């Protein structure tokens, strides 16, 4: 028996309990998931692979937790069995929306708002927010995490996490759970221009690995990338030198205990369009050095004065090259403006 019909531009899919009708082709539900997801991903990820920058924004925004974003690919983390609210904003009054979920339970819609209750099993699930009057979609990657209380001392399923320090402020509360990383989900696009693999801690281990990843840092990186391209430069993504760090790894490299990397809210980045694993010469002076990073710094720093950017305010710091790496820019979210140059 039919449950609902969704119009997606040239595609019309009828969702039943087991199959989806797409045109004259009968598809398994999993295959239909891929088609719907591909519509949101194709516009940006294909452009990235072809060397063409596309910001990857929808014509509306979606609020999850404290962040409202119009990027077509978004990521949230949620503990097993808990709920998250989703609300559409910045859309015309005539716009009509619907949601498709591949698991969990969805509340009845109210004023463009829904509540999704996550499944009890830790895994990657997806929520599609679809504008039905015109073809426009946001895909939410919902990672149901492995709860922190599953830690056995410093280890989670054999992967060494370490111990989080006592939180001096609310933003340093211990994570409620960890995203499980496997070879199968490494290449998931967690935003239009960044993949999960870019944020995995560098400590040596087998699989599974675990990460914490804040949606705010993903949005901040996407906004900086968008402004970088708008300023006349070109990059399809940033190379992430360091994303999430476990407390164990962070201590091993001698970093400060309260580094925002440990909460999945920081990234060390540089531009590497030529694939040489080193900062590109973006200012055209014939050298690849800290002056190129300062171009990136200035673009990111200018954003801090904008009202819509305040939820992403945090640290911004430049680092020069050494024997282990080239110059890079540190970006984080911490609720207050901090700047440094090294």
Model region roles, listed by residue range:
Residues 257-342:
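Catalytic cores and adjacent binding grooves of peptidoglycan-active enzymes
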Residues 2-15:
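N-terminal Sec-pathway targeting helices
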């Amino acid at each position: 028996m039919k449950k609902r019909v969704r119009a997606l531009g040239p595609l019309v899919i009828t969702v039943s309990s087991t199959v989806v009708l797409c045109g004259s082709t009968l598809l398994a539900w999993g295959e239909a998931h891929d088609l719907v997801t591909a519509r949101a991903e194709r516009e940006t990820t294909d452009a990235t692979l072809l060397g063409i920058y596309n910001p990857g924004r929808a014509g509306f925004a979606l609020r999850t937790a404290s962040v409202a974003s119009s990027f077509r690919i978004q990521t949230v983390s949620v503990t097993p069995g808990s709920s998250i609210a989703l609300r559409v904003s910045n859309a015309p009054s005539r716009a009509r929306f619907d949601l498709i979920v591949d698991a969990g339970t969805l509340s009845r819609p109210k004023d463009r708002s829904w509540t999704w209750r996550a499944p009890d099993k830790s895994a990657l699930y997806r929520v599609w927010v679809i504008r039905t009057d015109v073809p426009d979609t946001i895909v939410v990657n919902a990672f149901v995490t492995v709860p922190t209380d599953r830690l056995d001392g410093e280890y989670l399923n054999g992967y060494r996490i370490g111990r989080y320090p006592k939180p001096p402020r609310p933003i340093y509360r211990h994570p409620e759970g960890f995203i499980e990383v496997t070879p199968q989900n490494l290449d998931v696009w967690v935003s239009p221009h960044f993949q999960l693999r870019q944020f995995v801690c560098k400590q040596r281990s087998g699989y599974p690995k675990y990460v914490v990843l804040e949606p705010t840092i993903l949005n901040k990186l996407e906004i900086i990338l968008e402004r970088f391209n708008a300023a006349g430069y070109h990059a399809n993504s940033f190379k992430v030198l360091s994303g999430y760090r476990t407390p164990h790894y962070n201590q091993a490299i001698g970093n400060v205990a309260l580094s925002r990397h440990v909460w999945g809210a920081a990234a060390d980045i540089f531009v590497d369009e030529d694939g040489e694993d080193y900062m590109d010469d973006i200012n055209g002076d014939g050298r690849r050095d800290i002056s190129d990073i300062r171009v990136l710094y200035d673009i990111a720093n200018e954003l801090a004065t904008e009202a819509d950017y305040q939820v992403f305010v945090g640290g911004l710091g430049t680092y020069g090259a050494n024997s282990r790496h080239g110059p890079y820019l540190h970006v984080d979210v911490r609720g207050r403006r901090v700047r440094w140059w090294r």
